[in-house]
């Protein structure tokens, strides 16, 4: 059934839709299956995403037609279609009238992902109008609150030096806590790796008690505040709340030094919102493990990394992993810095829409995945600043002189970049950074040709 007369209006102007403020706009790359027209398939897509189905139904009235999702732009050659969704379509909480990402996903990338006439469709960007934007929780905390705990300026406080305890699984409570203590002697921040929780060989409560003790000892020994991000992810919100409360009680006077890690992609919006609403005074660390199945550039379905990041900010993530933009081991490219800008800026330009975030607090980019001291300057050059949480697992624990030296090498690389000094030159007076060149020699050869001669290190 051709539904284009009802669900397509190519006379609508995007500028007018934005000015009107009553539509969420979504841009997709869509390809119909052979034998199906582009506009007709786009119309069916919009119908299935809003008020329609594959046949006309007798219960449809004029009000229903007034909230149809409408295809307002198509470029068949580029495979681009844009759809305007009236804000009235989206579900809202009965307890407080707030909007929900679950409803946004259900409409915009729900049944339309399995339609028989659609070969593939991937959302590349979306726009939220100002009034509707205020119905999302947004972040309660961000990197500024970490800087405050660390005693830094709350504006442009610089990189938070972090790590992930490795191996990601297999450490019992004491070795895990000992590794935390060692890193904290040189670094700022430690996170649970995403699968770490309450394994039989590492009971959650035993581990957290020992980590809290390691934090106290490291702070006493260094005179500096330390930070820990604890994984509270679970299927059951009650379990998440129980874990979170136990951690706050266990860390006691250092409760403000704790973040809560939530595996937001695999556990979903409910898990993120459970943390955001039950622990608004705690940094909400959104880990995106699993997202590549949907967001990868190789995938032609689902949604993009940018869409994922924008949803995380709406949900209330204090910080989210953004990848390393091609400078680490994970898939990515330098032009993905727009992802970080969309998280941290009050207004940012996406591939299709300019999003004004109004008064919504910024979300912090968390950088991880194959980073070490030698890779940081190039990353910061590309991003244009260093106001990120950076977590290096192998980059710290793979240092030839151990995790303390690894942490210090990361800090020294940041110092060199901030001062505009070449890394090789800075390494001449900083043994930990010099050790990073030896520890990650293949990176050194690629990024800093001639480093061995300048540092007088034999091959």
Swiss-Prot record:
Annotated coiled-coil positions are none
Tell me yes or no: is Metal-binding among this UniProt entry's keywords: yes
What reaction does this enzyme carry out catalytically? 2 (2R)-3-phosphoglycerate + 2 H(+) = D-ribulose 1,5-bisphosphate + CO2 + H2O; D-ribulose 1,5-bisphosphate + O2 = 2-phosphoglycolate + (2R)-3-phosphoglycerate + 2 H(+)
The source's domain of life comes to Bacteria
CDD domains linked to this entry? RuBisCO_large_II (cd08211)
What is the required cofactor set for this protein? Answer: Mg(2+)
EC number(s) on file: 4.1.1.39
Site (described: Transition state stabilizer): 329
Q: What is the protein's known function?
A: RuBisCO catalyzes two reactions: the carboxylation of D-ribulose 1,5-bisphosphate, the primary event in carbon dioxide fixation, as well as the oxidative fragmentation of the pentose substrate. Both reactions occur simultaneously and in competition at the same active site.
What is this protein called in UniProt?
Answer: Ribulose bisphosphate carboxylase
Species name: Paramagnetospirillum magneticum (strain ATCC 700264 / AMB-1)
Tell me the lineage of the source organism: Bacteria, Pseudomonadati, Pseudomonadota, Alphaproteobacteria, Rhodospirillales
